[in-house]
Protein backbone atom coordinates (compact mmCIF):
# COMPACT_ATOMS: atom_id res chain seq x y z
CA UNK A 1 0.00 0.00 0.00
CA UNK A 2 1.17 3.54 -0.79
CA UNK A 3 -1.70 5.65 0.48
CA UNK A 4 -3.54 7.55 -2.24
CA UNK A 5 -0.73 7.16 -4.76
CA UNK A 6 -2.00 4.26 -6.85
CA UNK A 7 0.10 5.10 -9.92
CA UNK A 8 3.29 5.03 -7.85
CA UNK A 9 2.16 1.86 -6.10
CA UNK A 10 1.53 -0.02 -9.34
CA UNK A 11 4.80 1.21 -10.85
CA UNK A 12 6.70 0.04 -7.76
CA UNK A 13 4.94 -3.32 -8.00
CA UNK A 14 6.15 -3.63 -11.58
CA UNK A 15 9.73 -3.13 -10.41
CA UNK A 16 9.37 -5.78 -7.71
CA UNK A 17 7.83 -8.17 -10.25
CA UNK A 18 10.80 -7.83 -12.61
CA UNK A 19 12.98 -9.08 -9.74
CA UNK A 20 10.88 -12.23 -9.32
CA UNK A 21 8.59 -11.13 -6.50
CA UNK A 22 4.80 -11.46 -6.70
CA UNK A 23 3.46 -8.10 -5.48
CA UNK A 24 -0.10 -7.78 -4.17
CA UNK A 25 -1.32 -4.25 -4.85
CA UNK A 26 -4.21 -3.11 -2.68
CA UNK A 27 -6.55 -0.13 -2.82
CA UNK A 28 -10.21 0.78 -3.24
CA UNK A 29 -11.48 -0.70 -6.51
CA UNK A 30 -12.78 2.61 -7.82
CA UNK A 31 -9.28 4.10 -7.65
CA UNK A 32 -7.13 1.03 -8.28
CA UNK A 33 -8.75 0.25 -11.63
CA UNK A 34 -8.85 3.82 -12.96
CA UNK A 35 -5.97 6.02 -11.80
CA UNK A 36 -3.11 3.59 -12.55
CA UNK A 37 -4.75 1.91 -15.54
CA UNK A 38 -1.85 2.92 -17.79
CA UNK A 39 0.67 1.43 -15.38
CA UNK A 40 -1.38 -1.77 -15.00
CA UNK A 41 -1.44 -2.12 -18.79
CA UNK A 42 2.29 -1.49 -19.09
CA UNK A 43 3.07 -4.05 -16.39
CA UNK A 44 0.94 -6.62 -18.17
CA UNK A 45 2.55 -6.02 -21.57
CA UNK A 46 5.96 -6.55 -19.95
CA UNK A 47 4.80 -9.99 -18.73
CA UNK A 48 5.31 -9.17 -15.07
CA UNK A 49 3.15 -11.05 -12.56
CA UNK A 50 1.10 -8.86 -10.20
CA UNK A 51 -2.05 -9.44 -8.14
CA UNK A 52 -4.40 -6.46 -7.86
CA UNK A 53 -6.67 -6.44 -4.80
CA UNK A 54 -9.64 -4.09 -5.08
CA UNK A 55 -11.79 -3.44 -2.00
CA UNK A 56 -15.20 -1.72 -1.81
CA UNK A 57 -16.04 -3.09 -5.25
CA UNK A 58 -19.52 -2.63 -6.66
CA UNK A 59 -22.47 -0.44 -5.74
CA UNK A 60 -22.26 -0.68 -1.96
CA UNK A 61 -21.60 0.91 0.45
CA UNK A 62 -23.97 3.58 -0.74
CA UNK A 63 -22.91 6.32 1.68
CA UNK A 64 -19.56 7.55 0.28
CA UNK A 65 -21.07 8.53 -3.09
CA UNK A 66 -20.38 7.68 -6.70
CA UNK A 67 -16.67 8.58 -6.63
CA UNK A 68 -16.17 5.56 -4.35
CA UNK A 69 -18.72 3.20 -5.92
CA UNK A 70 -16.71 0.90 -8.20
CA UNK A 71 -19.29 0.20 -10.88
CA UNK A 72 -17.01 0.48 -13.92
CA UNK A 73 -14.01 -1.47 -12.67
CA UNK A 74 -14.66 -4.58 -14.77
CA UNK A 75 -14.90 -2.41 -17.87
CA UNK A 76 -11.72 -0.53 -16.92
CA UNK A 77 -9.72 -3.74 -16.56
CA UNK A 78 -11.13 -5.39 -19.69
CA UNK A 79 -8.46 -4.13 -22.05
CA UNK A 80 -5.59 -5.53 -20.00
CA UNK A 81 -4.01 -8.59 -21.60
CA UNK A 82 -3.11 -11.65 -19.52
CA UNK A 83 -5.45 -10.54 -16.72
CA UNK A 84 -8.01 -12.74 -14.98
CA UNK A 85 -10.80 -11.09 -12.98
CA UNK A 86 -12.27 -12.93 -9.99
CA UNK A 87 -14.74 -12.05 -7.24
CA UNK A 88 -14.51 -14.27 -4.14
CA UNK A 89 -17.81 -14.61 -2.27
CA UNK A 90 -16.71 -15.92 1.14
CA UNK A 91 -13.73 -16.09 3.49
CA UNK A 92 -13.05 -19.63 2.25
CA UNK A 93 -13.06 -18.44 -1.35
CA UNK A 94 -10.70 -15.58 -0.52
CA UNK A 95 -8.10 -18.09 0.69
CA UNK A 96 -8.69 -20.40 -2.28
CA UNK A 97 -8.52 -17.67 -4.90
CA UNK A 98 -5.50 -16.01 -3.31
CA UNK A 99 -3.65 -19.32 -3.50
CA UNK A 100 -4.85 -19.73 -7.08
CA UNK A 101 -3.73 -16.19 -7.92
CA UNK A 102 -0.23 -16.78 -6.61
CA UNK A 103 0.14 -19.95 -8.69
CA UNK A 104 -1.45 -18.60 -11.88
CA UNK A 105 0.95 -17.34 -14.57
CA UNK A 106 -1.46 -14.49 -15.32
CA UNK A 107 -2.06 -11.17 -13.64
CA UNK A 108 -5.11 -11.24 -11.38
CA UNK A 109 -7.69 -8.67 -10.34
CA UNK A 110 -9.44 -9.79 -7.15
CA UNK A 111 -12.70 -7.87 -6.75
CA UNK A 112 -13.77 -7.73 -3.11
CA UNK A 113 -17.00 -6.76 -1.41
CA UNK A 114 -15.76 -5.46 1.94
CA UNK A 115 -18.97 -4.72 3.83
CA UNK A 116 -20.91 -7.26 5.93
CA UNK A 117 -23.17 -9.61 3.98
CA UNK A 118 -25.06 -12.85 4.40
CA UNK A 119 -24.56 -15.95 2.30
CA UNK A 120 -26.98 -18.78 1.48
CA UNK A 121 -26.92 -21.86 3.69
CA UNK A 122 -24.11 -24.29 2.86
CA UNK A 123 -22.58 -21.82 0.38
CA UNK A 124 -19.01 -23.00 0.95
CA UNK A 125 -20.07 -26.65 0.68
CA UNK A 126 -21.71 -25.92 -2.68
CA UNK A 127 -18.83 -23.81 -4.01
CA UNK A 128 -15.90 -25.52 -5.69
CA UNK A 129 -12.95 -23.76 -7.28
CA UNK A 130 -12.81 -24.91 -10.87
CA UNK A 131 -11.54 -22.46 -13.45
CA UNK A 132 -14.31 -20.94 -15.55
CA UNK A 133 -17.07 -22.73 -13.65
CA UNK A 134 -19.91 -21.20 -11.67
CA UNK A 135 -21.49 -22.82 -8.63
CA UNK A 136 -25.14 -23.84 -8.56
CA UNK A 137 -26.51 -22.61 -5.24
CA UNK A 138 -30.10 -23.66 -5.88
CA UNK A 139 -31.52 -25.86 -8.63
CA UNK A 140 -34.45 -24.73 -10.74
CA UNK A 141 -36.25 -25.01 -14.05
CA UNK A 142 -36.30 -23.03 -17.32
CA UNK A 143 -34.96 -19.85 -15.71
CA UNK A 144 -31.46 -19.20 -14.34
CA UNK A 145 -30.37 -16.16 -12.32
CA UNK A 146 -26.63 -15.56 -12.20
CA UNK A 147 -24.46 -13.10 -10.29
CA UNK A 148 -20.93 -12.71 -8.99
CA UNK A 149 -21.69 -10.36 -6.09
CA UNK A 150 -22.26 -11.87 -2.62
CA UNK A 151 -24.66 -9.05 -1.74
CA UNK A 152 -26.70 -9.61 -4.88
CA UNK A 153 -26.55 -13.38 -4.39
CA UNK A 154 -28.30 -12.91 -1.05
CA UNK A 155 -30.90 -10.65 -2.68
CA UNK A 156 -31.44 -13.17 -5.48
CA UNK A 157 -31.96 -16.03 -3.02
CA UNK A 158 -34.62 -13.92 -1.29
CA UNK A 159 -36.12 -13.13 -4.70
CA UNK A 160 -36.33 -16.84 -5.46
CA UNK A 161 -38.54 -17.35 -2.40
CA UNK A 162 -40.84 -14.61 -3.70
CA UNK A 163 -40.85 -16.09 -7.21
CA UNK A 164 -41.76 -19.52 -5.86
CA UNK A 165 -44.99 -17.94 -4.62
CA UNK A 166 -45.69 -17.27 -8.32
CA UNK A 167 -44.83 -20.89 -9.28
CA UNK A 168 -41.52 -19.81 -10.77
CA UNK A 169 -38.50 -21.86 -9.70
CA UNK A 170 -35.25 -20.37 -11.03
CA UNK A 171 -31.83 -21.95 -10.83
CA UNK A 172 -29.40 -19.69 -8.94
CA UNK A 173 -25.71 -19.62 -9.89
CA UNK A 174 -22.82 -17.82 -8.23
CA UNK A 175 -20.11 -17.09 -10.81
CA UNK A 176 -16.79 -15.89 -9.35
CA UNK A 177 -14.95 -15.84 -12.70
CA UNK A 178 -15.62 -12.51 -14.40
CA UNK A 179 -13.81 -12.97 -17.71
CA UNK A 180 -12.82 -16.65 -17.85
CA UNK A 181 -15.48 -19.18 -18.85
CA UNK A 182 -15.42 -22.91 -19.49
CA UNK A 183 -17.41 -23.65 -22.64
CA UNK A 184 -18.35 -27.16 -21.57
CA UNK A 185 -19.68 -25.82 -18.28
CA UNK A 186 -21.77 -23.21 -20.10
CA UNK A 187 -23.27 -25.84 -22.39
CA UNK A 188 -24.03 -28.21 -19.54
CA UNK A 189 -25.49 -25.68 -17.09
CA UNK A 190 -27.11 -23.00 -19.27
CA UNK A 191 -28.27 -24.55 -22.54
CA UNK A 192 -32.00 -24.09 -23.23
CA UNK A 193 -32.43 -21.79 -20.23
CA UNK A 194 -33.53 -18.17 -19.96
CA UNK A 195 -30.48 -16.57 -18.33
CA UNK A 196 -30.92 -13.42 -16.25
CA UNK A 197 -27.65 -11.82 -15.17
CA UNK A 198 -27.74 -9.49 -12.17
CA UNK A 199 -24.70 -7.32 -11.52
CA UNK A 200 -23.60 -4.30 -9.48
CA UNK A 201 -21.80 -2.69 -12.43
CA UNK A 202 -22.82 -0.60 -15.40
CA UNK A 203 -24.45 -2.58 -18.18
CA UNK A 204 -21.74 -1.36 -20.54
CA UNK A 205 -18.50 -3.28 -20.25
CA UNK A 206 -19.59 -5.52 -17.40
CA UNK A 207 -19.67 -9.23 -16.74
CA UNK A 208 -22.87 -9.71 -18.74
CA UNK A 209 -21.20 -8.51 -21.93
CA UNK A 210 -18.32 -10.91 -21.41
CA UNK A 211 -20.29 -14.07 -20.76
CA UNK A 212 -22.79 -13.13 -23.50
CA UNK A 213 -19.91 -12.98 -25.98
CA UNK A 214 -18.68 -16.38 -24.82
CA UNK A 215 -22.20 -17.82 -25.22
CA UNK A 216 -22.60 -16.28 -28.69
CA UNK A 217 -19.64 -18.32 -29.91
CA UNK A 218 -21.33 -21.58 -28.96
CA UNK A 219 -24.06 -23.44 -30.80
CA UNK A 220 -26.59 -23.31 -27.98
CA UNK A 221 -29.99 -21.80 -27.32
CA UNK A 222 -29.96 -19.29 -24.46
CA UNK A 223 -32.08 -16.18 -24.03
CA UNK A 224 -30.24 -13.52 -22.02
CA UNK A 225 -31.50 -10.54 -20.04
CA UNK A 226 -29.49 -8.25 -17.79
CA UNK A 227 -30.37 -6.38 -14.61
CA UNK A 228 -27.59 -3.88 -13.89
CA UNK A 229 -26.84 -0.19 -13.44
CA UNK A 230 -28.03 2.10 -16.20
CA UNK A 231 -27.21 5.47 -14.61
CA UNK A 232 -24.73 7.09 -12.24
CA UNK A 233 -25.17 5.38 -8.87
CA UNK A 234 -27.07 7.19 -6.15
CA UNK A 235 -25.85 7.56 -2.59
CA UNK A 236 -27.85 6.75 0.52
CA UNK A 237 -28.32 3.84 2.85
CA UNK A 238 -27.45 0.48 1.34
CA UNK A 239 -31.11 -0.53 1.18
CA UNK A 240 -32.12 2.77 -0.43
CA UNK A 241 -29.45 2.39 -3.09
CA UNK A 242 -30.38 -1.23 -3.86
CA UNK A 243 -34.05 -0.30 -4.12
CA UNK A 244 -33.42 2.72 -6.34
CA UNK A 245 -31.32 0.76 -8.81
CA UNK A 246 -33.67 -2.23 -8.89
CA UNK A 247 -31.25 -4.58 -7.16
CA UNK A 248 -33.13 -5.39 -3.95
CA UNK A 249 -34.90 -8.74 -3.66
CA UNK A 250 -38.35 -7.25 -4.24
CA UNK A 251 -37.22 -5.16 -7.21
CA UNK A 252 -35.39 -8.12 -8.76
CA UNK A 253 -38.54 -10.22 -8.42
CA UNK A 254 -40.64 -7.51 -10.09
CA UNK A 255 -38.16 -7.13 -12.95
CA UNK A 256 -37.98 -10.88 -13.54
CA UNK A 257 -41.76 -11.16 -13.63
CA UNK A 258 -41.87 -8.37 -16.21
CA UNK A 259 -39.28 -10.18 -18.32
CA UNK A 260 -40.93 -13.60 -18.34
CA UNK A 261 -44.62 -12.78 -18.32
CA UNK A 262 -46.28 -11.65 -21.58
Tell me what each language-model feature is.
Residues 1:
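Short pre-catalytic strand/loop immediately N-terminal to key active-site residues, enriched for Gly-Thr
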Residues 5, 15-144, 153-154, 170:
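Conserved thiamine diphosphate
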Amino acid sequence: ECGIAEQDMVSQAGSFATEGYIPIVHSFSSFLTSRPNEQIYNNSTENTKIIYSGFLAGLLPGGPGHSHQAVRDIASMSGINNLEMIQPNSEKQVKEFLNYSIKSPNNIYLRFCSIPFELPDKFDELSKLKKGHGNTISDGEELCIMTYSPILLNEICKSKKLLLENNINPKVISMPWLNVFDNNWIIKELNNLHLIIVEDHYVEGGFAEKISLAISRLDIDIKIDVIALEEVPKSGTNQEVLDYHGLSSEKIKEKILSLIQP
